Amino acid sequence: MAQDDNRSKALNAALSQIERQFGKGAVMRLGDTPRVATPAISTGSLGLDIALGVGGLPMGRVVEIFGPESSGKTTMTLSVIAQGQKQGKTCAFIDAEHALDPTYAEKLGVNLDDLLVSQPDTGEQALEICDMLVRSGGVDVIVVDSVAALTPRAEIEGEMGDSHVGLQARLMSQALRKVTGNIKNANCMVMFVNQIRMKIGVMFGNPETTTGGNALKFYSSVRLDIRRTGSVKQGDEAIGNETRVKVVKNKVAPPFRQAEFQILYGKGIYHAGEVVDIGVQQGLVDKAGAWYSYQGNKIGQGKANAAQFLEDNPAIMEEIENEIRARLLSTPKPEAESQEKAAAAQDDDSLV
């Protein structure tokens, strides 16, 4: 017992010295902080929010979205920005590809007047702007589109055909080392859009890899693999893409879940269609033949008409969506838990 007391005193002395040297809160017991559910921003896709396990993409983390060309990567990031702006959050878009279409962004629900946009000349400039925005503490969501377009200054100033081996990977590695701590402190989500490249000479396994080295894979809390699986057709005309998103890495919930949804051209993620599909799966929306009904009332013949009814009646759609989220998102109630523990501790004290 005496030895335990000495160890405890030594630990307390060390903690006091650390707090004096580095400030209060430099070291603390994990149980001292209140447990809160991970704050998240919806992706705009109900199925993907459920697959992510926390109702969306987590705040204060790095997120990577990658996939082939025209798979919906930028559409996904603009959808997240639109959802964030609805919650009153400040969003920024670092357009390294110089390909942002304001008209399309507006159609997806983005408020252009409030969106901060930067079109940097070099990769260093883009990441420096990102770091300064994070450190300001006034930005909630930052999108970098894309990692492949973050061209190092040496490459831009050099001759065409010059070899710059590993330059972009070193740039990303250094930037992420610098910015990660600030991202957590500012509770800001930074989303990196990435492209796919092929590894040469791979005989077995997946030859696909993402650009910018391995650092982003390690620092990301969530990695989403987005793919186009087919076309949505109205008669002979293609009006959208069938899209599948796989959560290949998730530090805030179980990974490897999948979500499938439609992205309609000029409209974005087909949210009402997802609510109908998942509502049928959960037994909230009844389907008899081609007719869909909710609480005994017919809402439309065919999925398109049922979805249109929900779009015209947002209160009913919100009611169905809230019920789906309550059933499928097993979010703990940390406040209730902490209150129960406090009450139990008081009971124990009174018994003593």
From Swiss-Prot:
One of its GO terms (biological process) is DNA repair. ATP binds at residues 67-74. InterPro entries: AAA+_ATPase, DNA_recomb/repair_RecA, DNA_recomb/repair_RecA_CS, P-loop_NTPase, RecA-like_C, RecA-like_N, RecA_ATP-bd, RecA_C_sf. One of its GO terms (molecular function) is damaged DNA binding. CDD domains: RecA. SMART domains: AAA. It is found in: Cytoplasm. Keywords: ATP-binding, Cytoplasm, DNA damage, DNA recombination, DNA repair, DNA-binding, Nucleotide-binding, SOS response. Belongs to the RecA family. Can catalyze the hydrolysis of ATP in the presence of single-stranded DNA, the ATP-dependent uptake of single-stranded DNA by duplex DNA, and the ATP-dependent hybridization of homologous single-stranded DNAs. It interacts with LexA causing its activation and leading to its autocatalytic cleavage. This is Protein RecA.
